[in-house]
Every structure is written in C-alpha cells, then in structure tokens.
C-alpha cells in the first residue's frame, strides 16, 4: 500500500495525502461511511458515490460473519462483488462488537467465546478466525483482532488487555503470512493501539504497534465515554509515536468538530455511525451548527435544507418539509437527513484537505469548530 503525503500544515500536525489500494485511491483526510452489514443504512450505492462522494466504506466482520455468512460471501467472490461496490472497503475485526456483548462472551488467551445477538448460537473468535473471515470478506483494509477495554478500566485490567491485544496482533500477522489473499487483490492489515486512558500504556502500545511496520495504524478504545479533552490528549500522544509515513486511523470518531480537531493532531482516517444514526433521529449537521429538525421552530421554515451544499437533497427539500416527514414518521425523512449528513461529513474532510494544501487549515478549523458545534 502506497501512502503519499502531499502537504503538511505549518501550524498543526494536519496533513493531506493519498492512499492507494487495488480498488482505487483514497484522498486524506477521509471519512468512511459505515456500512455494517454491507449497506450504509438508507443510502443507495449510486448516491454514496455520486452525491456523497464516498471513496471508501466500512463493513463489520462480526455482522457479516453472522449474516450473510462467509460461505455466501465466498460464492459471491467477496463482499465487493456481493454488494456490487467497486471502491475500497475497510472491515473492522469484530472485536469491538464481540466485547460489547458483555453478558454473553468470555475472553481467554485463545480468543472470545460469545453468543450471537441474533439467535443465541455459540461462536468463537480468535485472531486467526478473525483474519480467516476477513480474507473471505475480501476488504482492502483489514483490522487486527483486539480487545477494546471498557471505560473506565482499572490500570491492571487495561495493562493486561493491552498485552493481550499485542499477542493477538502477532497471531494475526502470522496467519496472514501463511494464508494469502483469496480474490486476487491485496489486503492490508492495520493493527490497533490500545491502553485505555493511561498515558504510559498508550505510549507502550503505540511503540509496539509502530514496530510491526504494517501498512497503516489505527487508534482504538477512544470516544467510548471518556472526556473529549482526554481523547484529544491520547490521540496526540499516540500520533507523536506512530510513523509519519503511514496512514493513521482513529476508530469511531466522531462529531464534525471532533474530526477537525483530530485532523489537526495528525489523523488521516475516520469512521462513525453518528451521521446516519443521528440523522435517523432528526439531527442535522451543518457548517453553521446543529439542527434538530423535530423542533417546532422549523415548522414554517421553507428555506432549503442546506443551500451551501450542492447535493440533490440539499437543493431540493425545505426544512419545513423534512420536519413534516419526521413528524409523520415517513421513511423518506431519515433517508434525506442520512444523505445530507454524509454529504456534509465528506464535504468537511475534503474542505480540510484543501485548507491544508493552501496553508489556511488552522485558522479555518478554529472558526469551523466553534460554528459547527452551535445548536441552532
């Protein structure tokens, strides 16, 4: 995997680059819409590429393993062919989802035994099993199997969990070395920095992850309930250690202002369910602030959803109409807001890229963070 950095910001650690995969290039900073089971909720593929301008989407190993299952994905020729998606895909390892099943899983050195949230059936994920499943799924970027400790975690638990993640990483690498790609294109492993909210553990984990010289590196276990400033602090500490010539992926983050602040810290890649999940509840992100479209103040507002954006939904529907759809519980309402929020997120990271390249990123970022976080 080639990652070329084209510009650095003079006043922060932000950078603009291009990541090359066998399914196409990805310009960074980038936001990856979350397509958990092979679809971004409520959004057509055509709109993902033509309206939202998505360059890569994210799939979930745990969910794709449970359904449709690896047998069907193998028959289809991998997830790209199954869903007829021609651009890059990243899959997480399933670790976060498995560990979120707190009452229905057991962690051992070997891996994690868990019960399906669908039918209660018993399953086991090991590092090797996660890599095997991700080979069958066939994503361009695959994540190492890790343990994501809950917040808060005591120091001893966090330390033991971090070391387990490191041992599991070695097993992931060993499996991939012995079991090559299935579908004729390259897959690239990103290991995950853990360490909970302990500075020394984060440093130790970042150093271990960096030593593996993988295609890129990820930061996990943040944005799980800790204070925002703590998330920024740990992100900066880790970015200071991870190699500058490899892409850095901050998992599960976040709000538009979180994303800009973390771009300034040196992060290149983001994913989050927030733009679509919040959209389904009527929350709309804009450059001027956050709208709750269900509020009565929008009942008679016939202005366009967002006249500053060129997407079809933004130039077609009024706030009053969208509010009407939500109040009537019409499915079109969440579809419109989901597309808008994703359009806005992709516009935001592309705008950040342009500001990095022209040398105005930090000034622009400071203005945007204040505006975007305002409740309208």
State each model region's role.
Residues 1-20, 26-33, 41-42, 146-152, ...:
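C-terminal extensions of enzymes
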Residues 155-166, 174, 199-212, 339:
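Short, electropositive alpha-helical surface patch
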Residues 33, 63-64, 96-97, 149-150, ...:
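Short, solvent-exposed loop/turn segments at secondary-structure junctions
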Residues 130, 161, 165-168, 172, ...:
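Alpha-helical packing segments of well-folded alpha/beta enzyme cores
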Residues 151-155, 159, 216-222, 331-334:
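Glycine- and acidic
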Residues 1-182, 296-299:
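Non-catalytic, usually N-terminal nucleic-acid engagement modules in DNA/RNA processing proteins
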Residues 179, 188-305:
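Glycine-rich phosphate/ribose-binding loops and adjacent secondary-structure elements
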Residues 24, 57, 92, 134, ...:
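Conserved, mostly hydrophobic/aromatic
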């Amino acid at each position: 995997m080639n990652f070329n950095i084209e510009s650095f910001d003079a006043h922060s650690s932000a950078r603009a680059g291009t990541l090359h995969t066998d399914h196409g290039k990805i310009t960074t900073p980038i936001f990856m819409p979350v397509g958990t089971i092979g679809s971004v909720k409520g959004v057509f593929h055509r709109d993902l590429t033509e309206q939202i301008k998505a360059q890569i989407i994210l799939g979930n190993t745990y969910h794709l393993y449970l359904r449709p299952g690896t047998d069907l994905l193998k028959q289809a020729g991998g997830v790209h062919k199954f869903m007829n998606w021609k651009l890059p895909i990243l899959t997480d390892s399933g670790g976060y989802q498995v560990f979120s099943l707190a009452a229905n899983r057991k962690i051992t050195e070997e891996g994690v035994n868990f019960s399906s949230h669908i039918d209660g059936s018993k399953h086991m994920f090991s590092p090797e099993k996660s890599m095997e499943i991700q080979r069958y799924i066939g994503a361009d970027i695959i994540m190492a199997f890790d343990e994501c400790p809950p917040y808060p975690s005591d120091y001893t638990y966090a330390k033991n969990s971090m070391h387990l993640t490191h041992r599991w990483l070695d097993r992931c690498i060993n499996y991939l070395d012995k079991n090559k790609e299935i579908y004729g294109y390259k897959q690239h492993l990103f290991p995950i920095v853990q360490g909970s909210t302990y500075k020394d553990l984060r440093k130790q984990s970042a150093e271990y992850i960096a030593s593996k010289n993988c295609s890129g590196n990820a930061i996990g276990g943040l944005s799980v309930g800790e204070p925002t400033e703590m998330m920024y602090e740990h992100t900066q500490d880790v970015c200071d250690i991870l190699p500058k010539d490899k892409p850095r992926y901050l998992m599960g983050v976040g709000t538009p202002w979180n994303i800009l602040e973390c771009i300034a810290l040196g992060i290149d890649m983001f994913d989050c369910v927030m733009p679509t999940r919040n959209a389904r509840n009527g929350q709309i992100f804009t450059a001027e602030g956050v709208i709750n479209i269900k509020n009565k103040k929008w009942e008679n507002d016939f202005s366009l959803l967002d006249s500053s954006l060129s997407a079809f939904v933004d130039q077609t529907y009024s706030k009053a109409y969208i509010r009407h759809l939500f109040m009537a519980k019409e499915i079109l309402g969440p579809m419109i807001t989901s597309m808008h929020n994703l359009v806005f997120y992709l516009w935001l990271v592309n705008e950040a890229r342009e500001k990095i390249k022209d040398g105005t990123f930090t000034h622009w970022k400071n203005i945007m963070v204040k505006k975007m976080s305002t409740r309208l």
